[in-house]
């Protein structure tokens, strides 16, 4: 008996341990079975949670992913909280068994996308909280099973759009929080059937306008502070770059609680408070067609591209009207692009006529006519001499529906066509094409390439041989979009005539033309170098001539100045010459004697320095006429004076060389006598001797000789 009780006790402990996970708090009192595992440092969902749990709290942990088995068979769970974890992945159908779940909190995690089957099976979910994640994508069918939602919070994410079609089906939705995202457009009519909506928050997005939805028309109070009364509808749209034109006039006419919103455009209203702008300033600009195709001629079966561009405020929508007066949309042979271009892939004779381009916006509309001419190809005559033409049938480019963007089928056809022709390389002026199509058309003569630019609708044709695999298109405009098609020209075996067939088309844009550095061409470089070298030579010659002229002028001025000085000195010296002067000098005069010796040596210079030597010698002679010589100079001086007396008896008309010889001999005698006397003179005593007399030189003869020397010097300088 005791053993049985012991076993029952162990079984009870084991059951209790299995029901409540470790570290968690379990409230097992019926009917509120709750498992509280918040802030327990869990890395994953505990596997031993009681499947009868009604409320499960796993917030503030470190759970990284949700598996299919984590919440399997928990059909009684009503409230699931997974907030503030690190969840980045949720396995598809992970919540499929939670058919009674009312609230799911996944806020403050690391989710980046919501897949199609993530919330499958949550048909009774009322509150879905996904704020403060990193969501960038929500699949189009992600909310298909949560149509009973009453509150959807997608705030503080990175969403540019959400599946608006799924939102339209949430008829029970009363709170939608989309604030602090990057949503730039809300389709018109999205909230038309959401009659229970009481709060819409689109604060801090990229919305430039809000559609005039009936939901907003019912609004009585626009709340930007977030405080609303139960009976009112609150719209919060502050922090958006509103474009204040006539499209927001309906919003301006509604009541409001504050005036915090401002306009971001147009420029005249930038920065102004939305509610303070008068209604008459909410203006729109009517459309104006700025560029369109005037006329186009194409061969039957070729591709025709009609262009139409317009501007206005707001941006006008462009649609086309066929010659039959019907609205054109995407079909098997026609494509209407968002930029206003109409592309007829294969033309027929019935397409000839006037197509109408219509640009419209809330301010009005503008129209332009484009004439399309289809050149008919000849066909084979049958036996009854009637022309046999294939029946093109009704024109399938005319429909009664409004034109829109490209359908998936048309995108596939375009992609298939573009795969046949590839732009291998495109520059600002050229494009290299490669052909990938198979040449299965018999009798091909050649290929025809036709293209036209965005700014020039005139077709340009090029013919290439059928064996070509590449083709280089030249002379293109920079930064221009081109539509290029390749047609096969072949011999039709049935009609025995030449026919054409479109092989493929492609659209490409050339690069922008930037200023680039190029090397100078060799011809231009050679001519430039010759001009530069010639200029340097001419400049050098001019500088050399100028230097010579300046030097000659300076030398000429100096020569005239020195001649005058020499003549004056000699005239003064000869005029005031002292004959037979003998004076005894003290020892201190020896320095003057040495200076006199150096001046005597200076007089031996060449004829180029005669002017300077004459000036020096004359100045020294004039200075020594009034000074006495030392005794050591007596013997040499007396001998030189005797020689001068002998030569002085000759007439003054002797040749010039004799006068020069006398001067040189006199200087030589002075140097020799000075050298001998300085060598024999004792250092501490000065002997006195008889004084010597200088030789007399006739003033007129000496002046004549000096003038002749100066003239000869000037002649040599000129040479």
UniProtKB/Swiss-Prot annotation:
Q: Signal sequence: where?
A: 1-17
One BP term from GO: negative regulation of inflammatory response
Residues on the membrane's Extracellular side span 18-529
Q: Does the keyword tRNA processing apply?
A: no
Instruction: Name the PANTHER family for this protein.
Output: LEUCINE-RICH REPEAT AND FIBRONECTIN TYPE-III DOMAIN-CONTAINING PROTEIN 5, SYNAPTIC ADHESION-LIKE MOLECULE SALM
Give the start-end ranges of region Disordered. 385-414, 615-694
Q: Which GO terms describe its cellular component?
A: cell surface; GABA-ergic synapse; glutamatergic synapse; postsynaptic density membrane
Q: Where is the LRRNT domain?
A: 18-51
Q: What name has this protein been given in UniProt?
A: Leucine-rich repeat and fibronectin type-III domain-containing protein 5
Q: Which residues lie on this side of the membrane: Cytoplasmic?
A: 551-719
InterPro entries this protein is in?
FN3_sf, Ig-like_dom, Ig-like_dom_sf, Ig-like_fold, Ig_I-set, Ig_sub, Ig_sub2, Leu-rich_rpt
Cystines in this chain: 308-357
The domain comment in this protein's record states: Lacks a cytoplasmic PDZ-binding motif, which has been implicated in function of related LRFN proteins.
Query: Which residue ranges traverse the bilayer?
Result: 530-550
Q: Which PROSITE patterns match?
A: IG_LIKE, LRR
Pfam families named among the record's database cross-references: I-set, LRR_8
According to the entry, every stretch annotated as the Fibronectin type-III domain falls at: 414-503
UniProt subcellular location: Membrane
Q: In UniProt terms, what function does this protein have? A: Cell adhesion molecule that mediates homophilic cell-cell adhesion in a Ca(2+)-independent manner. Promotes neurite outgrowth in hippocampal neurons.
Gene coding for it: LRFN5
Name the membrane topology term: Single-pass type I membrane protein
Q: Which domain of life is it from?
A: Eukaryota
Q: How does it assemble?
A: Can form heteromeric complexes with LRFN1, LRFN2, LRFN3 and LFRN4. Able to form homomeric complexes across cell junctions, between adjacent cells. Does not interact with DLG1, DLG2, DLG3 and DLG4.
């Amino acid at each position: 008996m005791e053993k049985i009780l012991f076993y029952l006790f162990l079984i009870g402990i084991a059951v209790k341990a299995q029901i409540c996970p470790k570290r968690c708090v379990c409230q097992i009192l019926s009917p509120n079975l709750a498992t509280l595992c918040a802030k327990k440092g869990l890395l994953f969902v505990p596997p031993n949670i009681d499947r009868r749990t009604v409320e499960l709290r796993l917030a503030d942990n470190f759970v990284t992913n949700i598996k299919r088995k984590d919440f399997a068979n928990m059909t009684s769970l009503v409230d699931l909280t997974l907030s503030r974890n690190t969840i980045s992945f949720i396995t598809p159908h992970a919540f499929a068994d939670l058919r009674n779940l009312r609230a799911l909190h996944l806020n403050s995690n690391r989710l980046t996308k919501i897949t199609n089957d993530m919330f499958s099976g949550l048909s009774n979910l009322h509150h879905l909280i996904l704020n403060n994640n990193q969501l960038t994508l929500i699949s189009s069918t992600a909310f298909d099973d949560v149509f009973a939602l009453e509150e959807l919070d997608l705030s503080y994410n990175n969403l540019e759009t959400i599946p608006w079609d799924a939102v339209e089906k949430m008829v029970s939705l009363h709170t939608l929080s989309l604030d602090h995202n990057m949503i730039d457009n809300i389709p018109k009519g999205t909230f038309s059937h959401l009659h229970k909506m009481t709060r819409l928050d689109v604060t801090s997005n990229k919305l430039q306008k809000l559609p005039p939805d009936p939901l907003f028309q019912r609004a009585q109070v626009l709340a930007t502070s977030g405080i609303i009364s139960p009976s009112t509808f609150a719209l919060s749209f502050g922090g958006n770059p509103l474009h204040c034109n006539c499209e927001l006039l309906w919003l301006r006419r509604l009541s409001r609680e504050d005036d915090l919103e401002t306009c971001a455009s147009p420029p005249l209203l930038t920065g102004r408070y939305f509610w303070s702008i008068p209604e008459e300033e909410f203006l729109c600009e009517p459309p104006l067609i700025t560029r369109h195709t005037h006329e186009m001629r194409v061969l039957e079966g070729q591709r025709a591209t009609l262009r139409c561009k317009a501007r206005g405020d707001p941006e006008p929508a462009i649609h086309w009207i066929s010659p039959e007066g019907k609205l054109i949309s995407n079909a098997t042979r026609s494509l209407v692009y968002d930029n206003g271009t109409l592309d007829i892939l294969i033309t027929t004779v019935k397409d000839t006529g006037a197509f109408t381009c219509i640009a419209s916006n809330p301010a009005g509309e503008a129209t332009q006519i484009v004439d399309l001419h289809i050149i008919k190809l000849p066909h084979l005559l049958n036996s009854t001499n009637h022309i046999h033409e294939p029946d093109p049938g009704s024109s399938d480019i005319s429909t009664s529906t409004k034109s829109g963007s490209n359908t998936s089928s048309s995108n596939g056809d375009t992609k298939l066509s573009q795969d046949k022709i590839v732009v291998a390389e495109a520059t600002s002026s050229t494009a290299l094409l490669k052909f990938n199509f198979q040449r299965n058309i018999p009798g091909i003569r050649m290929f025809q390439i036709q293209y036209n630019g965005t700014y020039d609708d005139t077709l340009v044709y090029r013919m290439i041989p059928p064996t070509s695999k590449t083709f280089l298109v030249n002379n293109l405009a920079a930064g221009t979009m081109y539509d290029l098609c390749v047609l096969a020209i072949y011999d039709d075996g049935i009609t025995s005539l030449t026919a054409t067939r479109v092989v493929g088309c492609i659209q490409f844009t050339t690069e922008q033309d930037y200023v680039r550095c190029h090397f100078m061409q060799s011809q231009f470089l050679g001519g430039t170098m010759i001009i530069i070298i010639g200029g340097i030579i001419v400049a050098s010659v001019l500088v050399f001539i100028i230097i010579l002229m300046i030097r000659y002028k300076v030398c000429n001025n100096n020569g005239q100045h020195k001649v005058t000085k020499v003549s004056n000195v000699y005239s003064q010296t000869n005029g005031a010459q002292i004959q037979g002067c003998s004076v005894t000098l003290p020892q201190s005069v020896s320095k003057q004697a040495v200076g006199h010796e150096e001046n005597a040596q200076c007089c031996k210079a060449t004829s180029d320095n005669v002017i300077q030597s004459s000036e020096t010698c004359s100045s020294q002679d004039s200075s020594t006429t009034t000074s006495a010589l030392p005794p050591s100079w007596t013997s040499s001086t007396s001998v030189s004076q005797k020689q001068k007396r002998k030569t002085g008896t000759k007439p003054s008309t002797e040749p010039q060389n004799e006068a020069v010889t006398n001067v040189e001999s006199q200087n030589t005698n002075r140097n020799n006598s000075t050298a001998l006397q300085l060598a024999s003179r004792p250092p501490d005593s000065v002997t006195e001797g008889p004084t010597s007399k200088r030789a007399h030189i006739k003033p007129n003869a000496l002046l004549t000789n000096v003038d002749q020397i100066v003239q000869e010097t000037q002649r040599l300088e000129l040479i």
